[in-house]
């Protein structure tokens, strides 16, 4: 009895522990669980209604406590039934993009007491029952976003509700009973209803706690006088973006809102502010009237508004302001007026404002039509501090026009037409401290211009065309601190011009024509910029021009300096930053930097340095950043960096370095970043092994042939290693050991042929590695071992033909795999078994011909699958059936003629993009389902074409021709579709009609020399048949129909062969009468009856083979063996008995996958650097940017976008959730070089083109030109599709609804600038000309077509959750770019042949060159029922032409009467047989089979028995025997 309480306490403790922890992922699929502190979050995605319901039930079984957040996202849930969430204890609920159209009345039953917040983002949601929210006593926040919701549920009675947000485009009215009895409601947001035009009386009556009411973005044009009555605590009212034209109506409505402080009426239709518009608003402090059509402020517009402080009137059409529009009592407190971008052309309006607003402190009149300021126009205002008159038409300012303004501190008059020819001085402003006169026409400056400004501190005279500064120009401004005279035409500045300015600390004289350093600078100066001048030499040490003891920054870049004087900088002992980049320096002497011991940053890039004294840097003991990029250094000696122990960043790229001394970096214990790319290194120097603190090293574009593990083993803190574009041949075991912090490894574009097992073992933090563009042929077992954090792998542009199933051992986090542009012929050769967590798989541009079920069976989490540019001619079975989360499936440019509806039956509801363009589709009744689907889903692309050129979506099939087919193209038959099989899976030949032909027959069964044998290919297969007689050798060309003994039309659709796997072939033989089996059991057809087999005699041979312990494969290609008599036998093998049971209508339960989903780690996503090829290099080797540097980013943790409870005085809700109608990321637009039609077809050869840039680029004033330094931006755009062409340049772009506007773009062939209009016109016109024939295609133009050359995929689509805002930094430039030069179509084009010609395309003349690649970031969402173009999948773009891979040669064809092995096929490379390491393949058919709802395992008396060659269990034989025995008993009893 004493043990019972202990047992109960133990059970309670276990339950408490389970309640506070997450169950394993496989237990609650398709949901996932994560912890955030002590809070539990459940996230269910990419599934359908039955799976989600099963997942929620599993969650209910495994989690007994409360669930803090439940997120259902990107599912296919058309409706939510009652008690959908069961008895789960949900605190916060999020539904986002699940295609929900309606919910039942009791969908939230049993959640009344616990639910605190609801967040619903469902664009297709049409109805929410009015009473569905009743009883939610603890509800604090509700958010609903939809496009179809016309009627809102009843919110009344939610006593705890504090926050309500509803955004719907179909809302037309707001009944008054919706908002009753809400005593705690503080915030209401009702937006987006363009049909909501009226607000009736008493709508918000009695909301005593309401503080913020937002009714913006609706169609309101009438509001009842008492619609907003009895809101005693309302502080903010937002009515912007409506159709309000009567501002007086609003003024009368808000008159009773005593505590109203902020009123927003911007973006309406207001044309005039009439008398009495705003009266008796005692607490109103901020009024927004901007972005209307206001032309006039009339008399008495504002009356008794004593607290009004800020008025926004910008972006209107104001021409006149009445002097008494703001009466003295009303305008006495106004402090800021924004009036920019109006049409005020007379200074009287400006004067009226100043007179009416005696306390005005800020006035912005920029962007108006003011042309002159007469005498005394702006005088006598005692409080004005800031006056902005930028971007007007000012040509005349009379003498003393600005005076008697003692408080004025800042005056801006940028971009006018002022000149020094006007009467001076303009002003008498003793308190003015900042003056901006940039972008005017002052050619000369003398003392009269700045007279009357004794307190001036900051002066901007840039971009004026100045040619002269008089020596006494600043005589009246002794307090001047900052002077900007950049971008002028000054050639000399007199030494006495600035000498008396004792407070001057910054001078910017960049981009002038100065020949020498400015003389006579005051000793207090701290910052000097002389960038972009014509300075050829620096003053000698004896000169006082650089005797500046306080100087901290000196920029002398982009000049013509050839040498540095001895001790030239010793007078600037406080110098911290020195830039001598882009000059003509040829050597560094030991005395060049003496005297500047405190220097921290030194830029010497892009000079001609070929000789540097090893003592030149000895004085720089404090140096932290050194840039020697793009010089001509050949070696790094022992003592060159010996005294720079604090160096943190060192750039030695693009030199000619061949050797590094073993002791060169002995003292660099602080070095974190080292760039040695673009040199001539032959190995990784031993001297680099001492960099213990190194975090980032770039050794790409060298001639390194071997990686010394003992050297890189010293980089214990390294995070990124780049070794691309070298000559590395092999990765040996343990090459990258002892690198515990390594996250990114780039080995692309090398000569790697072999990766030994364990070469990348034990890298616990490795997230991404790139082995693209190498010469890999196969990946063996345990090549990539123990990589728990690995997320992405890149193998594109190799020669891969085989990947072992155990190649990724203990790498369970892999979610992105790129295998495009390889030599895979069969998907069975890709070991995907251990990659169960894959979400993105790219198999584009291989030689795959058949897509079958088994190779893809384990990919339950796959979201995106790309198989473009293969030779796929058939999809067998249902390979996508186990992919409930599949959103993107692309099979462009293959050989598919027909696509069965049943192939996509289980994924049609969830898939967003199904791209089969470029296939020779037969537009017959079988394809009608796809045509209907394209129309029903409003698919944003034109879709595939028929062979006659029509679009499939617009093709119409007559009903009379499709009598036997349903709406999905499935042929209806009254007969039995089950093929007649024996217990081995043989199909009797009498069931195969004469007109049957396998579409892929001519292309199967052959391989190139050196390919591994297929799975299951062994001598045992041929033991079942008589030996074949050798046939004469055949040619490699396609076999024409004349060579065949008889025509072979397509297969009769009455025969369903879906229960077979991989490849099936049949001889043509006339069928026996009747299509079904003569034996049935209760209507189910029975296979062939063999009494000998029934009593055991038929299994003798199989038992003997089984006892010999030969592991037989699970699948095999069909074999045709020519017999002397001309008769043949056909074998078909089944993967398991469960496939056949589908025809017997037995429901088979899928086994739960034991997969670990540990990839959601809450880490900060870091922005990967994406390198451009946009700079100049002279005298060095051609070096390109890092080719396969991707922008893969670790997936955001699922907590991002979660809930924060919304309570008073607390910001909460789903704040980070991004609007799905907008895309984020880089949209890259480039110019098209060459013939557009050839480029679209993917034909071309890449070459490198150097860019020649000017030595000193000047800023340009034209909007169509770009300056020397481009700014790379990330813009949020509407979801229009922007076509990305192969040649890519990073530019700032913005995409609008119907067009793409490019702000800056440059061509790659010259320095000529291309205007945005020219760029868009050239690209769109040339490409649009291809689609003039079809109306639907003409509507799509090119923005709706995926890029033809996109064949690879980046990893940003892994989660399909919008990431947080990215901050893309400006990246260093490169001097070489890649472009695509078109070739003739005959060089590399694939011509589609007829049914009997399946000759593969010839290989290219040479392997693909190493080239640049770039990522394009887009997002994929479910295509909703609206006219909104959906973005394409994220794609990894390679700038080299795809072509066909090296070695993709013609395969041998099978004739109709024989199958022979040619001499070429017999010359196979001697490899380990495929069966070694394929135990997992055979084990999959040893699993327990659930035949009758149980899990019984059927065993024979001896060891387990397999089917001949197909690894089938003996249970199927036993089932045959049992069925036959029962049938015989029934027949005996009937007799």
Curated annotation (Swiss-Prot):
InterPro entries: Cys-rich_flank_reg_C, Dev_Immune_Receptor, Leu-rich_rpt, Leu-rich_rpt_typical-subtyp, LRR_dom_sf. It holds the Pfam family LRR_8. Residues 1-19 form the signal peptide. Residues 1253-1270, 1316-1328, 1377-1391 have a biased composition (Polar residues). Residues 1271-1285, 1293-1315 have a biased composition (Low complexity). SMART domains: LRR_SD22 (SM00365), LRR_TYP (SM00369), LRRCT (SM00082). GO terms for cellular component: cytoplasm; extracellular matrix; extracellular region. Keywords: Cytoplasm, Extracellular matrix, Leucine-rich repeat, Repeat, Secreted, Sensory transduction, Signal. Its main location: secreted. SUPFAM superfamilies: L domain-like (SSF52058). It is found in: Secreted, Extracellular space, Extracellular matrix; Cytoplasm. Disulfide bonds: none annotated. GO terms for biological process: cilium assembly; locomotion; sensory organ development. Residues 1398-1407 have a biased composition (Pro residues). Disruption phenotype: Viable and fertile. Larval locomotion is severely uncoordinated and the chemotactic response to sucrose is reduced. Morphology of the lch5 mechanosensory organ is abnormal, with disorganized cilia and neuronal cell bodies, although cilia still make contact with the cap cell. Required for normal morphology and function of ciliated sensory organs. This is Protein artichoke. It comes from Drosophila melanogaster (Fruit fly). The gene is atk.
């Amino acid at each position: 009895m004493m043990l019972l309480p202990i047992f109960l306490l133990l059970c309670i403790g276990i339950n408490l522990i389970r309640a506070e922890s997450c169950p394993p992922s496989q237990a609650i699929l398709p949901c996932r669980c994560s912890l955030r502190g002590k809070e539990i979050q459940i996230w269910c995605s990419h599934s359908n209604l039955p799976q989600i319901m099963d997942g929620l039930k599993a969650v209910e079984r495994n989690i007994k406590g409360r669930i803090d957040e439940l997120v259902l996202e990107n599912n296919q849930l058309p409706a939510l039934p009652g008690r959908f969430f069961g008895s789960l204890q949900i605190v916060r609920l999020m539904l986002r993009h699940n295609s929900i159209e309606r919910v039942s009345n009791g969908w939230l039953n049993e959640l009344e007491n616990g639910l605190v917040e609801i967040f619903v983002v469902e664009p297709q949601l049409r109805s929410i029952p009015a009473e569905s929210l009743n009883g939610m006593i603890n509800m604090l926040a509700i958010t609903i976003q939809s496009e179809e919701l016309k009627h809102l549920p009843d919110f009344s009675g939610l006593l705890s509700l504090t926050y309500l947000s509803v955004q719907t485009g179909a809302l037309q009215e707001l009944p008054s009973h919706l908002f009753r009895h809400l005593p705690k409601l503080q915030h209401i947001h009702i937006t987006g209803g363009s049909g909501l035009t009226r607000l009736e009386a008493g709508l918000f009556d009695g909301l005593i706690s309401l503080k913020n009411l937002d009714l913006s973005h609706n169609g309101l044009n009438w509001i009842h006088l008492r619609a907003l009555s009895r809101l005693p605590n309302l502080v903010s009212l937002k009515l912007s973006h409506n159709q309000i034209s009567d501002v007086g109506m609003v003024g009368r409505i808000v008159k009773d809102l005593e505590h109203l402080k902020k009123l927003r009426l911007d973006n309406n239709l207001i044309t005039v502010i009439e008398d009495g518009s705003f009266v008796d608003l005692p607490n109103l402090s901020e009024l927004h009237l901007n972005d209307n059509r206001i032309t006039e402020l009339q008399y008495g517009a504002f009356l008794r508004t004593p607290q009004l402080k800020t008025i926004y009137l910008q972006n209107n059409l104001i021409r006149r302001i009445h002097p008494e529009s703001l009466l003295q009592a009303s305008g006495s407190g106004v402090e800021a007026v924004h009036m920019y971008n109006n049409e005020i052309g007379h200074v009287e309006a400006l004067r009226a404002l100043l007179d009416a607003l005696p306390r005005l402190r800020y006035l912005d009149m920029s962007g108006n039509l003011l042309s002159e300021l007469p005498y005394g126009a702006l005088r006598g205002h005692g409080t004005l501090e800031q006056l902005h008159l930028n971007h007007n038409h000012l040509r005349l300012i009379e003498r003393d026009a600005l005076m008697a303004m003692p408080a004025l501190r800042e005056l801006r008059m940028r971009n006018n037409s002022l000149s020094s020819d006007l009467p001076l001085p303009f002003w008498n402003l003793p308190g003015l401290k900042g003056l901006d006169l940039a972008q005017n026409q002052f050619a000369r400056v003398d003392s009269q211009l700045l007279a009357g400004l004794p307190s001036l501190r900051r002066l901007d005279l840039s971009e004026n065309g100045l040619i002269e500064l008089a020596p006494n120009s600043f005589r009246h401004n002794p307090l001047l601190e900052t002077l900007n005279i950049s971008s002028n035409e000054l050639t000399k500045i007199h030494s006495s011009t600035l000498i008396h300015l004792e407070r001057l600390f910054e001078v910017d004289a960049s981009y002038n024509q100065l020949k020498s350093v400015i003389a006579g600078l005051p000793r207090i100066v701290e910052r000097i910029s002389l960038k972009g001048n014509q300075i050829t030499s620096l003053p000698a040490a004896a000169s006082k021009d650089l005797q500046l003891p306080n100087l901290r920054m000196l920029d002398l870049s982009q000049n013509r300096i050839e040498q540095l004087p001895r001790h030239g900088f010793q007078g600037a002992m406080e110098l911290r930053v020195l830039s001598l980049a882009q000059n003509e320096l040829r050597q560094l002497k030991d005395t060049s930097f003496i005297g500047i011991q405190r220097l921290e940053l030194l830029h010497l890039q892009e000079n001609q340095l070929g000789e540097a004294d090893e003592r030149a840097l000895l004085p720089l003991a404090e140096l932290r950043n050194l840039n020697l990029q793009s010089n001509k250094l050949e070696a790094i000696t022992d003592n060159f960096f010996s005294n720079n122990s604090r160096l943190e960043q060192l750039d030695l790229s693009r030199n000619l370095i061949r050797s590094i001394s073993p002791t060169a970096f002995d003292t660099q214990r602080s070095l974190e970043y080292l760039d040695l790319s673009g040199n001539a290194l032959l190995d990784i120097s031993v001297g680099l092994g001492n960099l213990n603190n190194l975090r980032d090293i770039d050794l790409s574009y060298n001639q390194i042939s071997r990686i010394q593990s003992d050297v890189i083993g010293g980089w214990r803190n390294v995070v990124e290693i780049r070794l691309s574009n070298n000559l590395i041949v092999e990765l040996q075991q343990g090459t990258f050991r002892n690198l515990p912090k390594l996250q990114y490894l780039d080995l692309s574009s090398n000569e790697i042929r072999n990766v030994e097992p364990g070469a990348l073992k034990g890298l616990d933090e490795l997230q991404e590695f790139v082995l693209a563009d190498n010469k890999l042929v196969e990946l063996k077992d345990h090549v990539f071992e123990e990589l728990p954090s690995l997320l992405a792998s890149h193998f594109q542009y190799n020669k891969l033909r085989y990947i072992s199933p155990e190649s990724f051992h203990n790498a369970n986090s892999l979610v992105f795999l790129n295998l495009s542009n390889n030599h895979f012929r069969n998907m069975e050769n890709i070991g995907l078994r251990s990659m169960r967590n894959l979400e993105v798989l790219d198999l584009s541009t291989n030689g795959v011909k058949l897509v079958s079920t088994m190779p893809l069976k384990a990919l339950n989490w796959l979201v995106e699958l790309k198989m473009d540019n293969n030779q796929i001619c058939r999809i067998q079975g249902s390979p996508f059936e186990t992919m409930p989360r599949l959103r993107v499936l692309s099979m462009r440019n293959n050989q598919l003629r027909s696509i069965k509806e049943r192939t996509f039956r289980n994924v049609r509801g969830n898939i967003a993009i199904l791209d089969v363009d470029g296939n020779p589709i037969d537009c017959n009744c079988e394809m009608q389902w796809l045509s209907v689907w394209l129309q029903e889903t409003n698919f944003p692309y034109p879709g595939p074409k028929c062979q006659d050129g029509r679009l499939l979506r617009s093709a119409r099939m007559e009903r009379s021709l499709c009598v036997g087919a349903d709406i999905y193209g499935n042929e209806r038959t009254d007969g039995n579709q089950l093929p007649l099989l024996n217990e081995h899976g043989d199909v009797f030949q009498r069931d195969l009609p004469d007109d049957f032909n396998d579409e892929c027959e001519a292309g199967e069964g052959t391989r190139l020399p050196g390919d591994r044998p297929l799975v299951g290919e062994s001598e045992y297969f041929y033991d079942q048949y008589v030996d074949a007689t050798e046939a004469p050798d055949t040619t490699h060309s396609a076999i024409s129909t004349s060579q065949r003994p008889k025509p072979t039309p397509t297969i009769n659709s009455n025969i369903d062969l879906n229960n077979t796997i991989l490849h099936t072939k049949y001889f043509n033989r006339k069928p026996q009468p009747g299509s079904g089996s003569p034996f049935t059991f209760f209507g189910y057809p029975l296979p062939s009856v063999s009494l000998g087999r029934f009593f055991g005699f038929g299994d003798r041979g199989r038992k003997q083979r089984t006892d010999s312990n030969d592991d037989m494969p699970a699948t095999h290609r069909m074999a045709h063996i020519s017999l002397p008599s001309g008769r043949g036998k056909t074998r078909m093998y089944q993967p398991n008995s469960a496939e056949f049971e589908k025809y017997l209508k037995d429901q088979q339960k899928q086994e739960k996958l034991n997969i670990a989903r540990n990839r959601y780690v809450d880490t900060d996503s870091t922005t990967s650097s994406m390198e451009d090829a946009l700079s100049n290099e002279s005298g060095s080797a051609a070096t390109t940017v890092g080719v396969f540097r991707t922008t893969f980013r670790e997936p955001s943790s699922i907590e991002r976008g979660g809930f924060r409870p919304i309570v008073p005085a607390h910001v909460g809700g789903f704040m980070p959730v991004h609007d799905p109608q907008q895309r984020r990321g880089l949209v890259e637009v480039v110019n098209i070089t060459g013939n557009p039609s050839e480029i679209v077809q993917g034909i071309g050869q890449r070459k490198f083109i150097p860019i020649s840039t000017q030595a000193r680029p000047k800023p340009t004033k034209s909007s169509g030109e770009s300056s020397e330094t481009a700014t790379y931006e990330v813009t949020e755009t509407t979801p229009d599709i922007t076509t990305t062409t192969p040649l890519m340049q990073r530019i700032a772009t913005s995409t609008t609804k119907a067009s793409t506007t490019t702000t800056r773009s440059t061509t790659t062939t010259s320095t000529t600038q291309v205007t945005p209009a020219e760029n868009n016109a050239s690209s769109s016109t040339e490409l649009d000309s291809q689609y003039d024939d079809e109306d639907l295609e003409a509507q799509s133009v090119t923005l709706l077509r995926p890029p033809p050359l996109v064949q690879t995929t980046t990893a940003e689509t892994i989660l399909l959750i919008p990431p947080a805002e990215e901050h893309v930094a400006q990246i260093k430039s490169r001097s070489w770019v890649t472009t695509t030069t078109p070739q003739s179509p005959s060089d590399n084009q694939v011509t589609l042949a007829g049914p009997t010609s399946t000759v593969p395309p010839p290989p290219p003349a040479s392997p693909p060159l190493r080239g640049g690649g770039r990522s394009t970031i887009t997002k994929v969402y479910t295509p909703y029922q609206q006219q909104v173009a959906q973005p394409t999948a994220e794609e990894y773009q390679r700038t080299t032409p795809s072509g066909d891979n090296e070695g993709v040669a013609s395969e041998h064809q099978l004739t109709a009467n024989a199958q022979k092995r040619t001499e070429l096929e017999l010359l196979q490379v001697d490899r380990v047989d495929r069966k070694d390491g394929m135990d997992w393949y055979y084990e999959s058919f040893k699993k327990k089979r659930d035949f009758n709802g149980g899990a019984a395992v059927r065993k024979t008396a001896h060891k387990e028995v397999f089917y001949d060659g197909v690894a089938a269990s003996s249970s199927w034989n036993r089932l045959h025997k049992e069925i036959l025995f029962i049938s015989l008993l029934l027949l005996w009893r009937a007799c």
